[in-house]
Amino acid sequence: MNNLLKLDTYSFDEKCVYCRNKLVLEKYCFYGWRYLYECRCKKCNKNFLIDMPIFSGIPYPAVYDKDKKKVVNDVADWWKDPLENINLRIVHENIISYLNINIVRKKLIVFNLLDFVFGHCFMRLEGLTYYIDNEEYKEYDFLVVIPSQLRFLIKNFENKISLIETSTSFSKYRYFYTCIDREIKNIIQNYCDVYCEMLKYPQQEFVRLAKLNIPIRKWVNEIDKIVIVYRKDRIVGVTNKSQYIFYKKLILMLKSLNTKIFLIGDKDKYRFANVYDLRVEKIDPDIDDIWNETCSGSITIGVHGSNMLIPSICSSYNIEFVNTDKLYNFGQATAFLENLNQQETIQKYRYIYGNEYLSNIDPKMVYALVKSIVVKMNYVFNAVRHEKFDDIDTIRKLYQMANNCKLTYSFYDKINSIICKIRKFINI
């Protein structure tokens, strides 16, 4: 039970930042992304909003002085700023698009899957799967607050939970929604004991993905498709036009490998010949299933980020373009699967490093890496299955050829950065 926070006055143990006197809990606030205690100090006569300790691995809690209208303790700016502007960020618009409540037992666990980053939402969802069909928690009902973009993943167990689905863009989950607060409070009053699941992330290993609606194929005997995850907001190069040129060159080279080439993601004005273009301008309810099935058993290629999380889970091999600023969040944006040993992880995940704009990544290098996987597929497959194979030197040479090209900053990098900014300004 150490992953669960019980909502009662006995478990509340926050102290005043000024006098260290124990605070009095007034009420809970379930505003969406962040859950808050509203409390006061009898001695100082101060009123506060304090983060509930349901997040692990982030700089909580922020302590907001309601009288001063500011966060009065030392926390990271990205965590502090939304709370300091809470009066401007409280939203009364109803974003609840679906509600299904099934009250059976006397105990409830609330799972908050909302976040402004897709990868964070997904990690919380994977944590939820631990509780589904777990005998240890058979005496509990589960209330899941989920963004509409992830609902398709819970088809396999949606009938076992109560559900609040919300519909808005991920970026807007930085706001505080009164409709969510009101609905959760209406539900929890029907229970004797209520708990919030305490998130444990950054998490670097996903072990219960079989319960989710994802077509995972870790290994295949032969690669017959390559999937490019195409984004307008995460691009290779300085502009969308330069990204188009990059992928056009890469696709021309990939055609020589006799594999099907698919594009998924954002549709823009640029078109590609001789590919299966599954990009869309607007997400519809079925497109995620189509994309995931397309990625299943493939080589996926794209710019590093949580947008690559599910494609990398479904695929047999994953190639991501990374600038050095993104190294810190590998654990949050990469799915290290259950039972993958070190050798298997090296096989599955490949990273190609570039500058800030990824403009110095050569399509020829990417092609060489893809070819090393496709052409030597049988060697690789035998290696990860721990069977005997003879061409170990060839495999090592192929790894070296596709080795990560980590760049160091120099005088030439500064010049290149200036050139990139000029190109971005004039859109070439």
Show which residues each predicted segment covers.
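Leloir-type glycosyltransferase catalytic cores
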Residues: 182-214, 332-428
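Short His-Asn-centered micro-motif
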Residues: 113, 144-147, 229-230, 263-266, ...
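A donor-sugar binding/catalytic signature common to diverse glycosyltransferases
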Residues: 288-335
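Well-ordered, non-membrane alpha-helical segments in soluble/globular domains
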Residues: 121-131, 241-253, 284-294, 367-370
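Secretory-pathway glycan-assembly enzymes, especially type II membrane glycosyltransferases
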Residues: 3-13, 17-221
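Catalytic donor nucleotide-activated moiety binding site of glycosyltransferases and closely related
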Residues: 146-149, 228-287
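Short loop/turn segments at strand-loop or loop-helix junctions that form parts
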Residues: 106-112, 196, 224-235, 264-266
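Short loop/helix-cap segments at secondary-structure boundaries that form the rim of catalytic
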Residues: 153-157, 269-277, 310-314
